[in-house]
Amino acid sequence: IMIRNLFKISLLSLFISPFLVSQELTSDITGTVSTSTGSVSGAQVEITYEPTNTSITRTTDESGRYFAGGLRPGGPYTITVSAAGLVSQNATTTLVVGDTRRLSFSMASADLVDELIVTGSRVTADRDGFTTLIDAETIATTPSVTRDIKDILKLNPFVTLDDEEDGEESISIGGAHPRTNDLRVDGVSFNDDFGLNSNGYPSQRSPINFGSIEQLAVKVAPASVEYAQFRGGVIDIITKGGTNEFTGDFAYFDRGDSLMGDKLEGEDIDITKDDTAYELAFGGPIIKDELFFYVTYSESEIANPLRYGIQGSGAENILDVTADQAEQVRSAVQSLIGKDPFGPTGATESSQENLTLRLDWTINEKHRLTFNHKDIFGNDLRGSSSSRNRVALYSSRYIKDEETTTNSFHLVSDLADNLISEV
């Protein structure tokens, strides 16, 4: 009996209304088709994603209602509605990840056309918590000196950046600890699970290339079964995909000492700092109208000056240790173990590389497959550091290597006009 009941429950779950299920990687379109006399049944609604010329067709039911789910966020989308004896209508829209766009059409007889009315609105009643949705255009026009998603997340008033720990800015949503957020890129979590970084990332800097973001959503305490393992909020990122047009970008950024002042309170200062990064992006069709790719690569290097150090170390703040005293310690240690206790002088260096690859395959009108691959490689010099009254020896430091690799598949299948499967 128990097995039979479980089977019934599983079977019933397949037919749960798609309007009650929120998708985290895709978007939906719904609406009605009507005339002045009532609903239009059997109307053909063709929905085309213009960048890839991918089309799906839906037929309105007895109440004139149609639904298309599992659609790629962004756009533009062209919706064409046609029915026997009625004038065809067109509408253009863009879609937001995890959202439902409502487009309703009021059609007129082909024999007498007075006015055509197309209305559109976004369904937001199913949103729980406070959400900020950010598209690629907003990202491109928002100033950012760090090329980090933190500059974009600040558009949500519940997001604050805290740099008290190790001088690294961390993301707090709704006042919660930075490590209690869930950062997801194309449905895969990129969190600091072991608590090794102050910024909450699994890497030294942003785990996603700034220019590869198609849409970003900041969700404050969303009450949904989709989300778990968070207390503050969820950051959902969808990356760009290829289209029928070849596109490419190159960007170079420099935030080194050439952009810093050379005086502080009237005194000359000499700071050596390197902070450079570059990004490459390229995408297009492998098979036109069917298979597409989009790849991005970025590399960044930062060399920060020592905050505290002995004379001759090039540090920002010189300790009360003379060069002669330091040399006495160095000579004594080298005579015992043959090592320089202070190690190299100058700057501490860290680097990071990000690689993303996305493939979109329109198998047919009913099945669409997306593959995402991401690599993050980085290293950073860690360990005890000198302070105003302490000189840290080089032996207390170590190189922290970081590597994160993820692969994910996302298959969307149209099982029926009102039944969508996402795996």
Regions found by a protein language model. Give the residues of each.
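Periplasmic N-terminal accessory/gating domains of Gram-negative outer-membrane beta-barrel systems
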Residues: 61, 85-87, 91-104, 115-241, ...
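A short, solvent-exposed loop/turn motif at the edges and junctions
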Residues: 50-53, 76, 80-91, 158, ...
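Outer-membrane beta-barrel translocator/receptor signature
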Residues: 197-198, 210-220, 225-236, 240-326, ...
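Residues on the lipid-exposed face of transmembrane beta-strands in outer-membrane beta-barrel proteins
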Residues: 173, 237, 280-284, 357-361, ...
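Periplasm-facing N-terminal accessory domains of Gram-negative outer-membrane beta-barrel systems
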Residues: 21-119, 124-125
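Extracytoplasmic loops and strand-loop junctions of Gram-negative outer membrane beta-barrel proteins
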Residues: 135, 198-202, 217-219, 261-266, ...
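Membrane-spanning beta-strand positions in outer-membrane beta-barrel proteins
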Residues: 78, 115-117, 182, 245-247, ...
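Outer-membrane beta-barrel domain signature, strongest for Gram-negative TonB-dependent receptors
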Residues: 301-423
